[in-house]
């Protein structure tokens, strides 16, 4: 499997989540020192992660805005330390070009933009400048849709075209339907059912639903975040069967056997 100029063995891969934030919904405050972050990265690599997704700002509902300066202070030391110690691809989870540039300079390989270039109009130019693969995620302000799966497909197709127009090569573009972002539980469920339509848009698809509210709802409610890892793994299997190629998860080990087996059947 290729992500731009990068090659990953197999037809599917796990992206391990590393939140260096104090307020992420699942693991906020757990990895706010470089050493704690490195220890977690080492474990995720041992468990089978092929990409580490580093984020310095929580995107949970109601989270506080973080300036680019503060975000850079959080992520750059961690990215540098990962690059110095491990041979692993790193993605930077940010929608700010200033942070993205600093992360690329520090050693990040991939851009993961939860606003698909809408927040910062220079993100696509930056991706083109660095020949960096970019993941474009569906997002919007309100939970209002004509038909959620079609609307998400239209959005992702339009944002991918905007990236192409800005000089990003097609093989550097990945898409993410954005589970949990501006979507009700019912809308997330409908989008899950229509996931194959997203996978038919002509771009590789990242699947990120780990520990989110819709997983809790599918389990009947009242579960803690870490109690959703088994269901997350089940949904990873479902997504790979629909055509997704990367699953973004907190618990790498719980997903590794699923990815290892299904990768051989894809």
Swiss-Prot record:
Residues that coordinate or bind (7,8-dihydropterin-6-yl)methyl diphosphate: 59, 93, 112, 176, 212, 248-250
A GO CC term attached to the entry: cytosol
Class of this enzyme: transferase
GO molecular function terms noted in the UniProt entry: dihydropteroate synthase activity; metal ion binding
Residues annotated as domain Pterin-binding: 12-260
Keyword field contains Transferase: yes
Record Gene3D superfamilies: Dihydropteroate synthase-like
Quaternary organization: Homodimer or homotrimer.
Pathway: Cofactor biosynthesis; tetrahydrofolate biosynthesis; 7,8-dihydrofolate from 2-amino-4-hydroxy-6-hydroxymethyl-7,8-dihydropteridine diphosphate and 4-aminobenzoate: step 1/2
UniProt keyword annotations, A-Z: Folate biosynthesis, Magnesium, Metal-binding, Transferase
EC identifiers of the protein: 2.5.1.15
Binding site for Mg(2+): 19
Homology family: Belongs to the DHPS family.
Catalytic activity: (7,8-dihydropterin-6-yl)methyl diphosphate + 4-aminobenzoate = 7,8-dihydropteroate + diphosphate
Protein name, UniProt field: Dihydropteroate synthase
Entry-linked NCBIfam families: DHPS (TIGR01496)
Keyword Metal-binding: yes
Organism field: Streptococcus pyogenes serotype M18 (strain MGAS8232)
Required cofactor names: Mg(2+)
GO biological process: folic acid biosynthetic process; tetrahydrofolate biosynthetic process
Role description: Catalyzes the condensation of para-aminobenzoate (pABA) with 6-hydroxymethyl-7,8-dihydropterin diphosphate (DHPt-PP) to form 7,8-dihydropteroate (H2Pte), the immediate precursor of folate derivatives.
